[in-house]
Swiss-Prot record:
Cofactor: Ca(2+)
Organism: Pseudomonas sp. (strain 101)
PROSITE patterns according to UniProt: SEDOLISIN
Variant or mutagenesis effect after changing residue 440 to A: No change in activity with casein as substrate
Result for mutant: residue 299 to A: Retains auto-processing activity but shows only very weak activity with casein as substrate
Bridged cysteine pairs (disulfide): 352-391
Protein name stated in the entry: Sedolisin
Reported regulation of activity: Inhibited by 1,2-epoxy-3-(p-nitrophenoxy)propane (EPNP), but not by carboxyl proteinase inhibitors, such as pepstatin, pepstatin Ac (S-PI) and diazoacetyl-DL-norleucine methyl ester (DAN). Inhibited by tyrostatin, pseudo-tyrostatin, AcIPF, AcIAF, chymostatin and pseudo-iodotyrostatin.
Gene Ontology annotations of biological process type: proteolysis
UniProt keyword list: Calcium, Disulfide bond, Hydrolase, Metal-binding, Periplasm, Protease, Serine protease, Signal, Zymogen
Signal sequence residues: 1-32
Designated gene of the protein: pcp
Catalysis: reaction(s): Hydrolysis of the B chain of insulin at 13-Glu-|-Ala-14, 15-Leu-|-Tyr-16 and 25-Phe-|-Tyr-26 and angiotensin I at 4-Tyr-|-Ile-5. A good synthetic substrate is Lys-Pro-Ile-Glu-Phe-|-Phe(NO2)-Arg-Leu
Residue segments, region Disordered: 276-295
């Protein structure tokens, strides 16, 4: 493994730098509670903010939401046998295992692993009893959404919702762990939507088209997405015309579809068969999100370009952007898995792993991603653009206090980091280094995310690399992400040069979709196969050997083999394709 940081990593356990609440709190009992006679069981949703985490930064009083104020929640249910599902997800994707390639079918999931109808109805009855309405159960029975009030939340889950500020943004959160009556303790996993301040964000860096720069490592310039197949040696592979690809978005994509049509027309490509899918409430907000527009443009055009100009279908799973916290994204992930149509799904979004763990999202979504892996689906997730400071990169980075991004830290996804890409004068691959652009004028670090999870255990397939003992390490692989060597993307009809690990992930998605088409969509979740194959055959990747993803002497360094900034490096698709044909990878 490549060498890590020169200075010792300290876990990011104190998540909140700015929480504007006074400490003069008599007790949480002042907020009230459900009847003492109720016997409560814990859930995965912790107190999102507690007195011990509060820093008194203003004179604003701590106020509980009025009982009648509206609240939208999503209840995540436990699998009937989560351990067995995770074992199955490993077995069907582990070369040499007797179950290899025997992916879980939707009907099998419902009969063996999904919560039973009786369990679902028990939770529905509890919600209805406490005043929730518009209760909706998703087809695979993993999520139940409902509309209610702060009073209903307190009655149903034994926690108040209070107003507070985080990083200058006002919102609300639960000040006690969410609980359920004991008879629901083995059914309910998380109660989501109890905080609305921290949300997942895109992983992109937008700029104007820059002039090419010739350096010792090669030429650094922006790239038409159609150039990535040549650069990463995929030209000999078939297009992804036989593979369906998914993209997770927040809000609508009407402008994205117009920009995608302009991209295909400008490059002489056929129009893409697309479908948009609303994944949350039918009354949700699925209008175009101007802030995220460049993200969905980057995702779709980079996927199609890397896929050789064709995919069977491009499915946009649109999250309700009005949903509380990250509940909309959780619903979008689940819809893609419940449908089980897209073979590979792009996620160019992420947020602080510690926050995801605190509100229960980490556990809820990990069940969804594990189901996807068991079904042979692959989620590709950007590793983050904050270097080693995903949780504390709001101003100048916090020294040796490192953190990573969720959902990239899930062991059931492929985490994709970022590089700075150099090409030859003829446009072929020359070299890559760790993507790190240093601090911007606001003191924010722009660099590839990488490190280790505080909450996720090390998967067995990572045993071939060292690193922090027992922890999920990330990223797994990397591709181009630097804004200066990024993709030339149509955004509102105009070309912009965009980078970030939001570029790296869709490059992989498009290339992986080509390999899926070449292998009749028989390839499953490839993490175990990647680690096994690359560790024994290093020529399958472009090893990234220089660079760092921190600042001021902190962060992790690149070197030979797997490392924290770039994982194994970028894939050589022609060599990987030949390896698959020769070694039965995925069959």
């Amino acid at each position: 493994m490549k060498s890590s940081a020169a200075k010792q990593t300290v876990l990011c356990l104190n998540r909140y730098a700015v929480v504007a609440l006074p400490l003069a709190i008599a007790s949480f009992a002042a907020f009230g509670a459900s009847p003492a006679s109720t016997l409560w069981a814990p859930t995965d949703t912790k107190a999102f903010v507690t007195p011990a985490q509060v820093e008194a930064r203003s004179a604003a009083p701590l106020l509980e939401l009025a009982a009648g104020e509206t609240a939208h929640i999503v209840v995540s249910l436990k699998l009937r046998d989560e351990a067995q599902l995770k074992q199955l997800a490993q077995a069907v994707n582990q070369p040499g295992n007797a179950q290899f390639g025997k992916f879980l079918k939707r009907r099998q999931f419902l009969s063996q692993f999904a919560p039973t109808e009786a369990q679902v109805q028990a939770v529905v009855a509890h919600l209805r009893k406490n005043g929730f309405v518009n209760i909706h159960v998703v087809p695979n029975r993993l999520l139940i959404s409902a509309d209610g009030s702060a009073g209903a939340v307190k009655a149903a889950f034994n926690t108040p919702l209070v107003r507070y500020q985080l990083n200058g943004k006002a919102g609300y959160a639960n000040t006690a762990p969410a609980q359920v009556p004991q008879d629901l303790g083995e059914i309910v996993g998380s109660v989501l939507g109890l905080q609305n301040v921290t949300r997942a964000h895109p992983m992109l860096k937008v700029g104007e088209r820059s002039a090419a720069k010739t350096l010792a490592a090669g030429t650094a310039k922006g790239h038409n997405p159609t150039e990535f197949p040549t650069i990463y040696d995929a030209s000999s592979a078939p297009t992804a015309a036989n593979t369906t690809v998914g993209i997770i978005t927040i809000g609508g994509v009407s402008q994205t579809l117009q920009d995608l049509q302009q991209f295909t027309s400008a490059n002489g490509l056929a129009s893409v068969n697309t479908q948009t899918i609303q994944t949350g409430s039918s009354n949700g907000d699925y209008s175009d999100d101007q802030q995220g527009q460049g993200e969905w443009d980057l995702d779709s055009q980079s996927i199609v370009g890397s896929a050789g100009g064709a995919v069977q279908q491009l499915l946009f799973y649109m999250a309700d952007q009005s949903a509380s916290g990250n509940t909309g994204l959780t619903q979008a992930f689940n819809q893609a898995v419940s449908d089980n149509v897209a073979k590979v799904i792009n996620v160019s979004l992420g947020w602080c792993e510690a926050d995801a763990n605190a509100d229960g999202t980490l556990q809820a979504e990990d069940r969804i991603f594990a189901t996807a892996a068991a079904q042979g689906q692959t989620f590709s997730v950007s590793s983050g653009d904050e270097g080693v400071y995903e949780c504390n990169n709001r101003g100048y980075p916090d020294g040796s206090t490192y953190s990573v991004s969720w959902p990239a830290s899930s062991p059931n996804v492929i985490a994709v980091g970022g590089t700075t890409l150099y090409t030859t004068s003829a446009g072929a691959y020359s070299n890559e280094t760790v993507w790190n652009e240093g601090l911007d004028s606001n003191g924010k670090l722009w660099a590839t995310g990488g490190g280790y999870s505080v909450y996720e255990s090390k998967p067995s397939w990572q045993s071939v690399v060292s690193g922090t003992p027992g922890r999920r390490l990330l990223p797994d692989i990397s591709f181009d992400a630097a804004q200066g060597t990024g993709a030339l993307i149509y955004n509102y009809g105009q070309l912009q040069q965009i980078g970030g690990t939001s570029l790296a992930s869709p490059i992989f998605v498009g290339l992986w979709a080509r390999l899926q088409s070449a292998n009749s969509n028989s390839l499953g979740f490839p993490a175990a196969s990647f680690y096994s194959a690359i560790s024994s055959t290093p020529s399958l990747v472009h090893d990234v050997k220089s660079g760092n993803n921190g600042y001021g002497g902190y962060g992790y360094n690149a070197g030979t083999g797997w490392d924290y900034p770039t994982g194994w490096g970028s894939l050589d698709i022609a060599k990987l394709s030949a390896y698959i044909r020769s070694n039965g990878f995925g069959h």
